Amino acid sequence: MTVPLTQYLLVAAILFTIGVAGIILNRKNIIIILMSVELILLSVNLNLVAFSASLGDLTGQIFALFILTVAAAEAAIGLAILVTFYRNRGSIAVEDIHMMKG
């Protein structure tokens, strides 16, 4: 039993919509914004893997692995900056980020 391509695309579209809604609706918490960006990247990966499997080509799956690697590095760096910012300022509000200049 195989799952049709349209169902994969529907799940990816739902994940993408949730990620965009998370960014639009919650602009005050940087952790929620980082998680929303990760959801968007995962939806893109799901699209790549679904189309790759549908077409019988491994290129999309390999590209998805590269995107996962970059997303993991982005999350690690983002969280490290967040922890440093919280230690220095005592807040993780997006409004306070402009004080990082210099």
UniProtKB/Swiss-Prot annotation:
The keyword Transport applies. Pfam families: Oxidored_q2. It is found in: Cell inner membrane. Its EC number is 7.1.1.-. GO terms for cellular component: NADH dehydrogenase complex; plasma membrane. GO terms for biological process: ATP synthesis coupled electron transport. The keyword Transmembrane applies. NDH-1 shuttles electrons from NADH, via FMN and iron-sulfur (Fe-S) centers, to quinones in the respiratory chain. The immediate electron acceptor for the enzyme in this species is believed to be ubiquinone. Couples the redox reaction to proton translocation (for every two electrons transferred, four hydrogen ions are translocated across the cytoplasmic membrane), and thus conserves the redox energy in a proton gradient. NDH-1 is composed of 14 different subunits. Subunits NuoA, H, J, K, L, M, N constitute the membrane sector of the complex. PANTHER family: NADH DEHYDROGENASE SUBUNIT 4L-RELATED, NADH-UBIQUINONE OXIDOREDUCTASE SUBUNIT ND4L. This is NADH-quinone oxidoreductase subunit K. It comes from Beijerinckia indica subsp. indica (strain ATCC 9039 / DSM 1715 / NCIMB 8712). The lineage of its organism: Bacteria, Pseudomonadati, Pseudomonadota, Alphaproteobacteria, Hyphomicrobiales. The gene is nuoK.
